[in-house]
Amino acid sequence: MKPEELSAERLREQIRSGDWQTPTSGAAQGYVQANLVMLPKKHAFDFLLFCVRNPKPCPILDVLEPGSFEPSIAPGADLRTDLPRYRIYRDGSLAEEVSDVSTLFSEDTVSFLLGCSFSFENAMLAAGLPIRNIEEGRNVSMYITSRPCTPAGPFSAPLVVTMRPMTPAQAVRAVQITTRFHLTHGAPIHIGDPQQIGIADLKKPDFGDPVTVRPGEIPVFWACGVTSALAATSPALPLVITHCPGHMFVSDLRDEDMTIF
């Protein structure tokens, strides 16, 4: 079975068994994908407030009770094992990347699942729009911008964006399509000159892989949930767990069920 034809449940099974270890862009098409942040209960409200104040990069899909690892948006799933790769931060610095966080998870851990732009890729592909990173077998390009998010408590971060190149006419269509997906970042936040949002070189993404921008194409930028990882690690907490960029949690929610019209 092709990756795009997998059900969300089947993909999670492959991830849990170690058979799938790569980014999830283009996989299980039609299912909503999510960013993950796990942090201590005492900081959960402030982080929730950060997400509420910054809904474009951090749209909330699910917040679990302390110590719970089975999300309501994917009954039977296990957030400790069902992502291809996790990042472990200690005192605000990246310590390691792992494929299982069961030994680090505790009764004090609160998990947040936030919408991901991979979720509207199926609609873009159906409209004949290019998803260059899928075409080239790469992770999506992600960049830290010069735009600040609204802080909350100890949490602050610059806005992170994903970039997908396309022609100007395709960009107009992409705006029309993605505006509907408000819980997975919605419409682009910027189209065109990357320097206007503080990006110096498209060939050097901060996360993910560079992709080819062809003659006649322009970069189109969407808010990205990796913003949440920068925010969660900004106060240098003893332990924070996030997804590894591009290695998302795939829920049982359907893309088309999450649109505003």
Describe each region flagged by the PLM.
Residues M1-G115, A126, I131, S156-L230, ...:
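Metallocofactor- and cofactor-centric catalytic cores in central/energy metabolism, strongly enriched
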Residues C116-F118, N133-T150, A169:
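Active-site glycine-rich loop that binds ribose-phosphate moieties when present
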Residues F120-E121, A229:
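Short, well-ordered alpha-helical microsegments
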Residues T150-S156:
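Contiguous alpha-helical scaffold segments within structured protein domains
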